[in-house]
């Protein structure tokens, strides 16, 4: 018979007596009515209290058989129990190892997604910081345009103080109006770009927070699974949770779990690329706007330079004509004085001639003769009158010419003053103010 502490690996050999439950059998004992009765005549017809020898043997055999059957059944049950315990132990070990392996694989998957989320968050943070720097460049560039706009507005207002006929729509004013329109357009463009950058920064932060929340959930789940992976049969912090094997209705599937994170990564990467494209666009915008402003500034300065040269040349010519006019006025004044003196000089000869004629008109009788002297005196008076008339007419012409020269002098002096005022406005007001125009680096938002 096998020992109880030995594990049987095969079925036991069949015994002599089959291992089955034997039915109990009732034996009818015959009444002892023979001569060997022990009860005498008083017990005639009744069984005695003693068993027969056969009954005794049969009873012993029945006890032997029952003991053997019970032992055999117990041994078989022990063998089956030991085998079942070994099988369940092996199964438990296999399932636990498989569960641990599955949890480990899950840890690897979560670590991979967690790393991707962390990388995406870091890239989004880095990209958002770069975009914030570009936004600050836009704001500095927008602030830098306030100076040029103030300059061009002041130039236009200053040039409105020019006097006629210099108050003209010249090339300088055309370039200034172009510059003012360009600055307004650039300011509107920069404002729109700043709004776009602010919106993109907000989207970047939103997707960063979404990835951070997903990353945080995965870190928490990773820590839970990592703790679960360390559990073993010797752990002291394990206990029974009868209802833990029930699946939650809100639980996700591996496909939806992976798709959930993939969507977050895809959207975050899409916004990151949009942010990169926006940064490149901002670079191009700032470079183009700063170059356009400087080119237009140079065009305005060139127009101012040409206009100042034109005004300077016109003033020099006016001053030259003024000098000639002044000389001519002086000469004309001397001429008028000479004419007046000539007229005055003709008065004495005319008086003499007229006095002679007058005195000779008092000659008596026949002496009042139209002699040659009389004719010569008459012609002398006529000649003197003609000379005086010519001199007076020439004097009137000279005086009118002098008045015209004076008017011309006044006009020239006024024009020279106007040109001087225009030069002062353009050169000392406008161009001096334009010397404070921002640099390209300031217009590009670097300073």
From Swiss-Prot:
The keyword Ribosomal protein does not apply. It is found in: Cytoplasm, Cytoskeleton, Cilium axoneme; Cytoplasm, Cytoskeleton, Flagellum axoneme. GO terms for cellular component: axonemal A tubule inner sheath; axonemal microtubule; microtubule cytoskeleton; sperm flagellum; sperm midpiece; sperm principal piece. One of its GO terms (biological process) is cilium movement involved in cell motility. Residues 82-97 have a biased composition (Low complexity). Ubiquitinated, leading to its degradation. Deubiquitinated by USP16, promoting its stability. InterPro entries: Tektin-like (IPR048256), Tektins (IPR000435). Keywords: Cell projection, Cilium, Cilium biogenesis/degradation, Coiled coil, Cytoplasm, Cytoskeleton, Flagellum, Ubl conjugation. Residues 72-81 have a biased composition (Basic and acidic residues). Microtubule inner protein component of sperm flagellar doublet microtubules. Belongs to the tektin family. This is Tektin-4.
């Amino acid at each position: 018979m096998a020992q109880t502490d030995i594990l049987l690996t095969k079925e036991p050999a069949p015994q002599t007596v089959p291992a089955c439950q034997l039915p109990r059998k009732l034996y009818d004992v015959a009444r002892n009515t023979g001569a060997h009765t022990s009860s005498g005549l008083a017990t005639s017809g009744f069984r005695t209290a003693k068993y027969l020898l056969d009954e005794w043997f049969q009873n012993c055999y029945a006890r032997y058989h029952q003991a053997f059957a019970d032992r055999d059944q117990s041994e078989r049950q022990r063998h089956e129990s030991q085998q079942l315990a070994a099988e369940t132990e092996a199964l438990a070990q296999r399932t636990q190892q498989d569960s641990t392996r599955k949890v480990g694989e899950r840890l690897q998957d979560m670590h991979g997604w967690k790393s991707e989320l962390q990388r995406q968050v870091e890239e989004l943070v880095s990209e958002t910081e770069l975009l914030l720097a570009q936004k600050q460049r836009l704001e500095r560039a927008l602030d830098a345009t306030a100076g040029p706009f103030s300059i061009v507005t002041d130039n236009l207002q200053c040039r409105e103080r020019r006097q006629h006929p210099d108050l003209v729509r010249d090339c300088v004013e055309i370039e200034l109006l172009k510059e003012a329109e360009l600055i307004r357009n650039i300011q509107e463009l920069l404002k729109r770009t700043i709004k776009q950058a602010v919106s993109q920064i907000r989207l970047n932060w939103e997707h960063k927070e979404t990835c951070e929340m997903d990353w945080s959930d995965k870190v928490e789940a990773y820590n839970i699974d990592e703790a679960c992976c360390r559990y073993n049969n010797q752990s002291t912090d394990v206990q029974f949770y009868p209802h833990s094997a029930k699946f939650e209705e809100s639980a996700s599937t591996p496909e939806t779990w992976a798709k959930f994170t993939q969507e977050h990564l895809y959207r975050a990467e899409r916004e990151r690329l949009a942010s990169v494209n926006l940064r490149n666009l901002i670079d191009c915008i700032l470079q183009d706007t700063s170059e356009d402003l400087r080119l237009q500034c140079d065009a305005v300065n060139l127009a101012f330079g040409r206009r100042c040269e034109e005004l300077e040349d016109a003033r020099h010519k006016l001053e030259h004509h003024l000098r000639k006019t002044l000389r001519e006025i002086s000469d004309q004044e001397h001429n008028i004085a000479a004419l007046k003196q000539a007229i005055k000089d003709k008065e004495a000869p005319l008086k003499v001639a007229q006095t002679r004629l007058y005195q000779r008109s008092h000659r008596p009788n026949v002496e009042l003769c139209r002699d040659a002297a009389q004719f010569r005196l008459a012609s002398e008076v006529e000649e003197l009158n003609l000379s005086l008339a010519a001199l007076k007419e020439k004097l009137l012409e000279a005086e009118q010419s002098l008045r015209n020269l004076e008017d011309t002098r006044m006009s020239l002096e006024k024009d020279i003053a106007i040109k001087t005022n225009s030069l002062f406005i353009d050169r000392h007001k406008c161009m001096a103010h334009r010397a404070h125009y921002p640099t390209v680096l300031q217009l590009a938002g670097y300073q």
